[in-house]
């Protein structure tokens, strides 16, 4: 008899009970955490992470990473972010803004019990790859005890590998370009359930360089989300904030009332350096600071490469590195790692390393080229003096850049002092650079590209109060780079563009109307330039010269009408008509109607026509388009329902207009109606466009899913072995074929040709089944075969 059903006993009972208790305890802790967050006082003062209502995994991750004390931006921003509010965070460089948005990301997803099947929960955008890698490493440290899946999506890596894993990610740290590529191309990647959007260095991401990309990314995201914006120079433009659909954002600026926008322990200086002496002073500075860690910022990648290669050949006695956007991702990451770990080193870099990167113990920040604005200056000098450490920064300014740049820095509350360089400390490397460029053509070519890129970077700057290209000594600067002469630059010319544009018009007005032949020739030349005709082989044949020896000499001896010029005549002499018996007086075209008229009358009429009718007038009469400007404008009539004609734009009667009310009221009413109509039409158009994009994306993703499903089905096809269930009932097959004794007929078959043999054998095979009709026939056949 079977035992009665009852509660499980034994070794399996205790683990099940412990799992139930653990799940119940987790639910109680989660509800308690949610209640603590709701009761959080936003006006309170928080000094450590333990004062905040954080979950156990986040608190353990912060403690393991040795984060205990809160900075100003962290204490104010984290509390608002935990409440689910949108934030505009602004703080000085090196003040801990990364933790200010990573902690709320982990906490908000933890309280919502986010899992893998819930999809993407948080998206963190960074302007550069290096900053994205740094954010991802911090996220891995503090989130090590969470169960979320986090991913890093940047350019320079395999797109297919990212596509395979992207659908399982809960948190993504990415750059805008690669993120948009996945949103457009990856079929299994959806963002409809996104909870948080974070923009680090928000002013740079919302700048014109990323504007179209960021707008496209935001178009894929849901509007119901929490948005966090952080930067050292935060944007307050209404247009930028409207693009992000922020809902009552909290502006957290902890250093807005501070005396300076840069760290207090940062010593800032500037040096007036003429453009041709910049490399000499930079070389002298590096030689005198061999036991320090220095970052040198330049305006373009080609300048970085040239300065790095030339200084590397000169061997200053300190390790040199260079970083720019044209390098491959593996090399860039290796350079960032090596520079972070080194104690004494010089890094030449573009603005790719100007924002957000945390290099430990940087002593000097040198800005060899003037930054484009004060915000860029603040971010550059922020690579040193981080987390209350000391640091020094030096800005190299040309005399033409001093006044404008100092005015911009003063507006941003940047304290900076002027210093002078001792003349006996300077070392000139001009001759050495010339020698290297003479010996190495590649270095010379790189120097030319560096010169052009620098001039172009100055030319495209918007602030012309700072960047005055015409006041720069470009020839001397080219010589200081070791070049034999200044390279030609296409966009720099002596005349202004407007003057060049208006020059042909001014020249055309000066021409008199009597010079019809000159104008006609000029028009013909311009037409030839504008519309090049196709030249056939016959045209080329008749345009050939020197077809015989006397061709050029003979052309000098004849006039245009074919008559000969006297040998002893001057240059302006007429043809010698006495040499020929008959001479041509006048030529007529074939089929001319005026052949019967007298010659004198024709000559007089031709002269009169030439005086009265001009070439331009003839062309004007032949062109309908040119005659339209002398005609009046046409009128268009519109008929009402009763059949009465009205003008297309008919003015209303004054009495009817006054009867409808005051003019200002009518104007306000009309503007309100039109604004409402355009607003509704705009909303409808946007919704239609969005729906079309979504349908197109869904069709593409469905197609990709079908292709993936077909590929998986093809891969999973397996050939099963034959069913062996009925083989036991059957007789076992013989292991060997029975021996057959060939008769004389078989011998005859072997002797016959192959084509007869095959036909005969096929005939036998066809007739054999018909002869076997009874069991006796089968036995006789078997005995015959067995012999």
Curated annotation (Swiss-Prot):
Biased composition (Basic residues): 9-25, 691-700
Domain Helicase ATP-binding: 78-252
GO molecular function: ATP binding; ATP hydrolysis activity; identical protein binding; RNA binding; RNA helicase activity
GO-annotated cellular components: nucleolus; nucleus; small-subunit processome
Primary location group: nucleus
Span(s) of short sequence motif DEAD box: 200-203
Self-association and partners: Interacts with the U3 and U14 snoRNAs. Associates with pre-ribosomal complexes.
Protein name stated in the entry: ATP-dependent RNA helicase dbp4
Source organism of this protein record: Aspergillus fumigatus (strain ATCC MYA-4609 / CBS 101355 / FGSC A1100 / Af293) (Neosartorya fumigata)
Organism classification: Eukaryota, Fungi, Dikarya, Ascomycota, Pezizomycotina
Gene behind this protein: dbp4
């Amino acid at each position: 008899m079977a035992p009665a059903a009852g509660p499980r006993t034994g070794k399996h009972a205790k683990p099940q009970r412990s799992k139930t208790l653990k799940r119940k305890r987790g639910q109680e802790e989660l509800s308690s955490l949610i209640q603590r967050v709701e009761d959080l006082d936003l006006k309170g003062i928080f000094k450590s992470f333990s004062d905040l209502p954080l979950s156990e995994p986040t608190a353990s991750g912060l403690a393991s990473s040795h984060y205990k004390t809160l900075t100003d931006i962290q204490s104010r921003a984290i509390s608002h972010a935990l409440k689910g509010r949108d934030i505009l965070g602004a703080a000085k460089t090196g003040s801990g803004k990364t933790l200010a948005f990573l902690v709320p990301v982990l906490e908000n997803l933890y309280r919502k019990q986010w899992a893998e099947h819930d999809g993407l929960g948080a998206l963190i955008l960074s302007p550069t790859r290096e900053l994205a890698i740094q954010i991802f490493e911090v996220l891995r440290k503090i989130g090590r005890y969470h169960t979320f899946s986090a991913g890093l999506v940047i350019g320079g890596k395999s797109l297919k590998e990212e596509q395979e894993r992207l659908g399982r990610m809960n948190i993504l740290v990415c750059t805008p370009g690669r993120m948009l590529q996945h949103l457009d191309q990856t079929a299994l990647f959806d963002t409809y359930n996104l909870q948080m959007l974070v923009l680090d260095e928000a002013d740079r991401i919302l700048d014109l360089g990323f504007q179209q990309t960021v707008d496209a990314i935001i178009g894929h995201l849901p509007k119901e989300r929490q948005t966090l914006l952080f930067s050292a120079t935060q944007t307050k433009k209404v247009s930028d904030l409207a693009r992000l659909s922020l809902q009552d954002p909290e502006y957290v600026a902890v250093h807005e009332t501070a005396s300076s926008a840069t760290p207090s322990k940062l010593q800032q200086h500037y040096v007036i350096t003429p453009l041709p002496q910049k490399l000499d002073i930079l070389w002298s500075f590096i030689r005198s600071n061999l036991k320090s860690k220095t970052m040198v910022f330049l305006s373009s990648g080609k300048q970085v490469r040239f300065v790095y290669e030339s200084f590397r050949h000169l061997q200053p006695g300190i390790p040199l590195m260079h970083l720019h956007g044209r390098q491959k991702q593996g090399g860039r990451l290796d350079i960032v790692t090596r520079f972070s770990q080194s104690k004494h080193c010089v890094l030449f870099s573009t603005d790719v390393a100007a924002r957000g990167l945390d290099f430990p113990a940087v002593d000097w920040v040198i800005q060899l080229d003037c930054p484009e604005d004060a915000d860029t200056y603040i971010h550059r000098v922020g690579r040193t003096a981080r987390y209350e450490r000391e640091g020094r920064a030096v800005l190299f300014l040309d005399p033409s850049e001093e006044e404008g740049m100092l005015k911009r820095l003063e507006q941003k509350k940047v304290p900076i002092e002027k210093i002078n360089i001792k003349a006996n400390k300077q070392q000139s490397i001009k001759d050495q650079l010339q020698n290297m460029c003479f010996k190495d053509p590649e270095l010379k070519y790189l120097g030319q590209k560096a010169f052009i890129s620098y001039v172009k970077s100055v030319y495209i700057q918007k602030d012309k109060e700072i960047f005055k290209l015409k006041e720069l000594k470009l020839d001397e600067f080219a010589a200081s780079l070791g070049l034999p002469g200044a390279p030609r630059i296409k966009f720099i010319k002596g005349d202004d563009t407007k003057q060049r544009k208006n020059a042909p018009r001014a020249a055309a007005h000066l021409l008199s109307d009597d010079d019809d032949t000159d104008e006609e020739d000029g028009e013909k030349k311009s037409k030839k330039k504008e519309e090049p005709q196709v030249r056939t082989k016959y045209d080329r044949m008749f345009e050939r010269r020197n077809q015989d020896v006397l061709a050029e000499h003979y052309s000098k001896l004849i006039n245009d009408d074919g008559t000969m010029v006297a040998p002893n005549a001057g240059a302006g002499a007429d043809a010698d008509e006495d040499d020929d018996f008959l001479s041509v007086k006048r030529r007529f075209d074939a089929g001319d109607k005026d052949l019967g008229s007298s010659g004198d009358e024709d000559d007089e009429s031709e002269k009169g026509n030439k005086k009265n009718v001009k070439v331009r007038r003839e062309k004007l009469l032949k062109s309908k388009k040119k005659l339209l400007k002398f005609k009046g404008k046409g009128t268009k009539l519109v008929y009402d329902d009763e059949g009465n004609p009205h003008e297309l734009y008919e003015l209303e009667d004054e009495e009817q207009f006054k009867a409808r009310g005051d003019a200002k009221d009518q104007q306000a009413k009309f503007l309100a109606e039109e604004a409402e109509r355009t607003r509704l039409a705009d909303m409808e158009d946007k919704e239609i466009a969005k729906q079309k994009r979504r349908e197109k994306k869904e069709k593409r993703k469905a197609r990709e899913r079908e292709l993936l499903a077909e590929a998986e089905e093809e891969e999973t096809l397996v050939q099963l072995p034959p069913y062996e269930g009925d083989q036991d009932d059957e007789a076992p097959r013989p292991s060997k074929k029975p021996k057959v004794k060939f008769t004389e007929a078989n011998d005859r078959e072997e002797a016959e040709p192959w084509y007869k043999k095959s036909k005969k054998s096929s005939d036998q095979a066809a007739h054999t089944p018909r002869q076997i009709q009874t069991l006796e026939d089968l036995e006789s056949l078997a005995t015959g075969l067995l012999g």
